[in-house]
Amino acid sequence: MPWKRASLFTSVSKKSLKITKKKPKRKEREQMAVMTVYHGGYQAVEKPEIRVGRNTKDFGNGFYCTVIKEQAQRWAKRYTTKVVSIYDVCLNSQLDVKEFDSMTEEWLDFIVDCRSGKEHNHDIVIGAMADDQIYNYISDYIDGTITREQFWMLAKFKYPTHQIVFYTKEALKCLKYRGCEVL
């Protein structure tokens, strides 16, 4: 996965990219772990917002992105006007980041909680996406139509997906808009 906990201690300066195993100095902590993320939609989003809707999402309400450009393009293809917004992420080490390296029992429980309306305390959550098919399996599991074991048998054959939700206003400050592509 492109985003690893170790990357939280990758300091970025204007002159060079400096990788350190020591905890960075206070000034260096402000901008860390630079990477590119994409958001697919129907318009360019220069100033992302956390929109609270009636639909429950995998990791709760927030601004969703991915490191997989093709996935953002698939998200955009749902609309008449197809736009992929591009951002640099400069992670603030003070934020609470929850990362799921793969679809695990903990990942499933977290998504079930979020899709049931339960709030969490993380600023950013990273992990696999429950696409439409996986979502149907999760719904069947929640409804008791299939067991947990049956869920995993069905889910393990899906292709990899990735999502990052910026859940708080502080998390949104990590995003620096670079531009967009109209598809």
Where are these regions (language model features)?
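Short, conserved beta-strand segments within well-ordered enzyme catalytic domains
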Residues: V37-H39, Y64-C65, S85-D88
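Extended catalytic/binding region for NAD+/ADP-ribose chemistry, centered on the ART fold
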Residues: R54-K77
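Short aromatic-glycine-(Arg/Gly/Cys) micro-motifs in beta-strand/loop hairpins
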Residues: M35-K57
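Conserved NAD+-utilizing ADP-ribose enzyme module
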Residues: W3, L17-V34, V45, D58, ...
